[in-house]
A protein has these predicted regions:
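Conserved blade-ending motifs and adjacent loop-strand segments that build the rim/top face
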Residues: 108-128
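Beta-propeller domain segments
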Residues: 1-111, 141, 148
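A general secondary-structure boundary signal
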Residues: 87-89, 112-115, 130-133, 137
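Blade-level signature of beta-propeller repeat domains, shared across WD40, Kelch, NHL, RCC1
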Residues: 123-148
């Protein structure tokens, strides 16, 4: 979970079962469907639901198809990455990449992936100096990304 830097809204990444990775912008009292509605499937390939929404179920703000195995997320708030400021970064366990998404209000658009991570991305955070730290498993390490 991360707090949007200007709206104060809580944004949450949801690693679905087999597929069904989502970003949800949390609203008080909203039901996001789990475990009855999902874009993914059970690991034994059985269907969780016939659809991913129903009356009273909030649709995800964004979902990845195919699944990236979404993990930690963060917003870029410092000027050190000027072209990325205001963007959302998401770690990918299955993709083994860092995913940058452009955010316009509540609209999320994939923009690019950062290659060369070489491991499952568990978490991403921006440091006070504006650099980005990426926690990677297999092998365990912390990468520091700085603007050129």
């Amino acid at each position: 979970m991360v707090i949007h830097p200007t709206t104060g809204a809580i944004w949450e990444s949801e690693h679905g079962p087999k597929g069904g990775d989502e970003i949800n912008i949390i609203a008080s009292g909203a039901n996001y469907g789990w475990p009855f509605y999902s874009l993914g499937m059970n690991y034994d390939n059985t269907i969780i639901s016939q659809g991913h929404t129903a009356a009273g179920i909030a649709a995800p703000s964004f979902s990845w198809t195919p699944s990236i195995g979404v993990s930690g997320i963060t917003f870029i708030t410092y000027n050190s990455f000027k072209a990325w400021k205001g963007n959302l970064l998401a770690g990918g366990l299955a993709s083994q990449k860092l995913h940058r998404c452009i955010v316009n209000g509540t609209t999320i658009t994939p923009a690019e992936t950062v290659e060369g991570i070489n491991g499952r991305v568990r978490h991403v955070a921006q440091a006070p100096d504006g650099s980005v730290y990426v926690a990677v498993e297999g092998p365990g390490r912390i990468l520091k990304i700085t603007a050129q």
